[in-house]
Amino acid sequence: MCFRTQLPLGRGKGAFRACVDGQMASVFKTYREWKISGDTQWLKQWWPTVKSLLEYAWSEKNPDCWDRDRDGILEGRQHHTLDWELFGPSSWLEGMYLAALEAGAEMAEYLGEQETAVRYRALFCKGYTYMKESLFNGDYFIQQVDLSCKDYIRCYDCPEYWNEEQKQLKYQICQGCEIDQMLAQWHAGLCGLGDIYDKQQRQTALRAMFRNNFKTSMRDFTNAWRVFAILDEQGTVMCDYPNGVQRPVIPIPYVDECMTGFEYAFAGLLIQEGMVQEGLQVLRAIRDRYDGEKRNPFNEIEYGSNYARAMASFALLPIFSGFAYDMVRGHIGFTPIEKGTFRCLWSLGPAWGEFFQEAACSTIVIRDGALPVSTATLGNAGKIVSIWADGENIPFAQEGQTVRFDATTVKTTLRFETAL
């Protein structure tokens, strides 16, 4: 895939090199859209393309050799959304690769390609083990790279990445605490992909990120890049180098900036992992900066006005509602962070509506479309005593937080009454 879509649409393909995080995300976003829609025919149509996107990582046609030796570890020249390249494994891009492998394995398995699924999962396991053992420094996840090694420059013919004065690679994370070091886990939580990073390690890393990257004041913080937070404003910086760890002379681009799209994803991951107050603090810092007096609340600037990445804020809706979905198997679920009365919007391919959580019942209301469903998870409901689909009482079986019933297409309401 080309790094950027050419606009306006119809101009044709760009000629720039492929982007690791964008290409891998296209794989698991396909998985996400399949689960949202339940449209397996659509998946079958695009599956050959999706496979080629994932397998480009080790393809001989890939001049950047992301995973040429097929060991599940990204080691080549890795272009990314921050506009330059990383050399050597990083938890950020490795995580995106692992999420794509996991999504690819599940899609392959469903489509009957068992051998493909086995290959993808074997690569996932190798990469997961490497990341757990070699990319976690005991406090947070890092990039493994030798800044003094000029072999990368020779191998990929990219002299622009070498700082001759300092004899050092440019634009690398190295030992820094980077805001996207577990971005793939945020995506995985939204898509239902499970663990991409070790649970205990990611909890430790999130605490370190909040401690190091979240700044309660910018007065004593030096930022030579673009200034999106000043004076007593709070914000989360892109990459911090705590406790005297080596900071490259020319580190990863935008290293000291506060950009809301990245901050929203970080806040979302904090909340997904149970660190709700920390996540809310990150969110309040953003909204305080864009309060309508200091800055336009409808234009959170990153690389320019109305930059799309700020729409990561919309992920907070499924995160706070604990929204789970799988239209392929007819499943929907809600486990709101708020245990009491709660109300939210939900949206899937076949239908959209509202969810209401109350003391004695939980109700899924369909505002448009029809919802084909046979299982539901209600994380806060307790024991279900009756289920009503479009006003009709239906039989069911409950296993923990999940209820199962005969497949039905709900057109108005699906109501779950609970024992008090």
Label every PLM stretch briefly.
Residues 1-6, 46-71, 122-140, 153-168, ...:
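Long, well-ordered core segments of solenoidal/helical folds
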Residues 36, 109-110, 191-193, 269-275:
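Alpha-helix C-terminal capping/termination sites
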